[in-house]
From Swiss-Prot:
<keyword id="KW-0106">Calcium</keyword>
<keyword id="KW-0479">Metal-binding</keyword>
<comment type="similarity">
    <text>Belongs to the phospholipase A2 family. Group I subfamily.</text>
</comment>
<dbReference type="GO" id="GO:0090729">
    <property type="term" value="F:toxin activity"/>
</dbReference>
<keyword id="KW-0964">Secreted</keyword>
<protein>
    <recommendedName>
        <fullName>Phospholipase A2 acanmyotoxin-3</fullName>
        <ecNumber>3.1.1.4</ecNumber>
    </recommendedName>
</protein>
<dbReference type="InterPro" id="IPR036444">
    <property type="entry name" value="PLipase_A2_dom_sf"/>
</dbReference>
<dbReference type="GO" id="GO:0046872">
    <property type="term" value="F:metal ion binding"/>
</dbReference>
<keyword id="KW-0800">Toxin</keyword>
<keyword id="KW-0378">Hydrolase</keyword>
<dbReference type="GO" id="GO:0016042">
    <property type="term" value="P:lipid catabolic process"/>
</dbReference>
<dbReference type="GO" id="GO:0004623">
    <property type="term" value="F:phospholipase A2 activity"/>
</dbReference>
<keyword id="KW-0959">Myotoxin</keyword>
<keyword id="KW-0442">Lipid degradation</keyword>
<dbReference type="GO" id="GO:0005576">
    <property type="term" value="C:extracellular region"/>
</dbReference>
<keyword id="KW-0443">Lipid metabolism</keyword>
<dbReference type="GO" id="GO:0006937">
    <property type="term" value="P:regulation of muscle contraction"/>
</dbReference>
């Protein structure tokens, strides 16, 4: 699901580096 995927990325982003993968994934998925 997109919601679960986004949530997982958000958690990983919070624990990991800045919002770099989130933007990339958002561009490809959203």
């Amino acid at each position: 699901n997109l919601l679960q995927f986004a949530f997982m990325i958000r958690q990983a982003n919070k624990r990991r580096r800045p919002v770099i993968p989130y933007e990339e994934y958002g561009l490809y998925y959203m």
